[in-house]
Amino acid sequence: MKPTTNGGLLASQSSSSFSFPRFRGQLPIIFSANNNQKKKNLPNPNVVTLCLHSHSNVSSSQIAVTRRAILVAPPLLAAAASLFLSISSAASAETSAESVALPPVATAPPPPPVEKEEAITSRIYDASVLGEPMAVGKDKKRVWEKLLNARIVYLGEAEQVPTRDDKVLELEIVRNLRKRCIESDRQLSLALEAFPLDLQEQLNQYMDKRMDGEVLKSYVSHWPVQRWQEYEPLLSYCRDNGVKLIACGTPLKVLRTVQAEGIRGLSESERKLYTPPAGSGFISGFTSFSRSSSLNMNPLTQIVPFGPSSYLSAQARVVEDHTMSQVIVQAVADGGGTGMLVVVTGANHVEYGSRGTGLPARISRKIPKKSQLVVLLDPERQFLRKEGESPVADFLWYSAARPCSRNCFDRAEIARVMNAAGRRRDALPQDIQKGLDLGLVSPEILQNFFDLEQYPLISELTQRFQGFRERLLADPKFLNRLAIEEAISITTTLVAQYEKRKENFFEELDYVITDSVRASVVDFFTVWLPAPTLSFISYADETIGPNSIDALRGLLGSIPDNAFQKSLGGQEWTLSLRIASVIIGGLKLAGVGVVSSFAAVGSSNALYAIRKFIKPELGVGEQAKRSPMLKTALVYGGYLGTSSNIRYQIIAGLIEHRISDELSSQPLLVNMISFVVRVANSYFGTQQWIDLARSTGLQTQKSVTTSNQIPEVASQSTVEYSTTEEASMDDLKNQ
């Protein structure tokens, strides 16, 4: 029985209908689904209608309903009903979704820009730990948190020999504390012992900008000139940023009276203001301390326990501490419960010590010691703290410009780098082990060393040759710079040779070969010698020889590798040392030039001899007049020691380190600058050498013989070696 169809599926948003397949003897059935949701008067918009159509061309005999048609019709009706009900539900859902407006998507506001924290280049040590003070790593967050938890922060600076480095640290600390105090809505004040308290009104006028720096300077005329220059940046910063300035020093008149006559020389009113009350224990404490110190230093002169000068100085110390303590307590009270006070004074006034007779001990009766924190700036010594002893301070803070010979980096960070790399200390080279023992190897340097060892060739060089290791640790791109220099050396040398020699290029080929080989060898040393190095073994430890040799090697080790090199590890190089580096570097390159010239000219002579042996006719038709090697060596050595030395020192120190460090975020630009500078240096340097060689007679440009010139007759026996490296032609007689 073959089915036939009368129609297809007719679908729209309002209604859908189609005809069921009709078999023989079956009535034509059309299914219609009405989905008109716009008619509100219909109780049910989804209507399914089954219609029996009678066609005019159907006979009455064909309308008979068979048993098979009755059995097939119900399942077809059920399937059609479920199909169109799902279609109508989807259409109604789509219509309702369109009619209901979606709520606007709430966009989160962009996060506020995170202010980049100022990099701290100074070195900080935690002096509160047992044993040797522990260097704090790059993350100084714990230090700042501890400082902010204190109400009073003492900055103890050098008293006998004040340095500019202390003022740099003070400005750095005040600047960072102010930034954090603003975030926590705290008022920051700065108390200065250098200003006597009777100058407070002048400081107020300076803060209100009613007085300029020159007028304020006139009130401290007893200061040395350099002292005002050191304090001026700190004072200007406080005035411009609203950090209150407080004078806490003892008036000069009172201090000089005590130093000359003692406390007895003060008037009754001055004693009440500047001396501690009777029974406080501080005067007796100082007396006993002075007495015991004198007895220990002079055990054989116990009849005179202490001299009058030490006694008067102790009394002056009492007056200074008492005066500052009173001003500090009052300033803390004026600052409220959240204010913060930074006190800049001499280190002897704030050290904790064994007796605790300084400012923290005096103020601890009103302000607990846990709210006071002591920072010593650039102390000369680092004391080992034993169990049961009080620390000398909470932190030791060193300027980045101060040299560091021990315990310079956080040993905990070093251990983390070692563990992450899976390396053992005894498997490292001896100089790095020595540096780890002294605390001179930074985590970054150690990580760079492990990264370099991932390459087999570089690992072999760093393990076997200390010179390569020292240069790669100081500059991981040293081999790249060396490869660039050697790659462009041959090319630029040949181009410059051709530019200068033109049509005589092939006639003067021996000159070209000599200069090219010599340039390739010398370029290695011009990159090697001025390159910065990083060594952890002193010269005295490397050799066991006479003291004079050790002293000479130590002197050479104290000179920078180039005049523009940055200070490494806090080592400060003076102008005289940088000038000495130019002289020493010139002597080294001059020696390289002399040795390379002997080798290059000797090889050129050997090459010519071999060429003459292979082609004997060259000895008749072309006889070379060779130059003495000594003159060439001296001229070339002088050229390297002057022109090349200065040019390569500028490239190594100024271009590839100082400028490259400023552009470290753009490595492609840095490499392009290095490449362009080295190409230009090699090209113009070669031209300078050619001009110098010709001006000194080492090389003279050949004259080209024209066709109408008559060649001069000369015999082979008359051809001798001249004092130039010029190859002259012995022309045969034109018979």
From Swiss-Prot:
Location in the cell reads:
Plastid, Chloroplast membrane
**Which intervals carry biased composition (Polar residues)?**
714-726
Per UniProt, the transit peptide runs over 1-75
| GO terms under cellular component | chloroplast; chloroplast membrane
Q: Which domain of life is it from?
A: Eukaryota
Identify the SUPFAM superfamilies for this entry.
EreA/ChaN-like
Any transmembrane segments, and where?
A: 519-539, 582-602
Which stretch is the leader sequence?
Answer: none
UniProt membrane topology term:
Multi-pass membrane protein
Which key words are in the record? Chloroplast, Developmental protein, Membrane, Plastid, Transit peptide, Transmembrane, Transmembrane helix
Record region (Disordered)? 714-735
Q: What happens when the gene is disrupted?
A: No visible phenotype under normal growth conditions.
Q: Name one GO biological process term.
A: chlorophyll biosynthetic process
Keyword Iron in record: no
Q: Describe its function.
A: May play a role in leaf development.
Name the family: Belongs to the RETICULATA family.
**Protein name, per record:** Protein RETICULATA-RELATED 5, chloroplastic
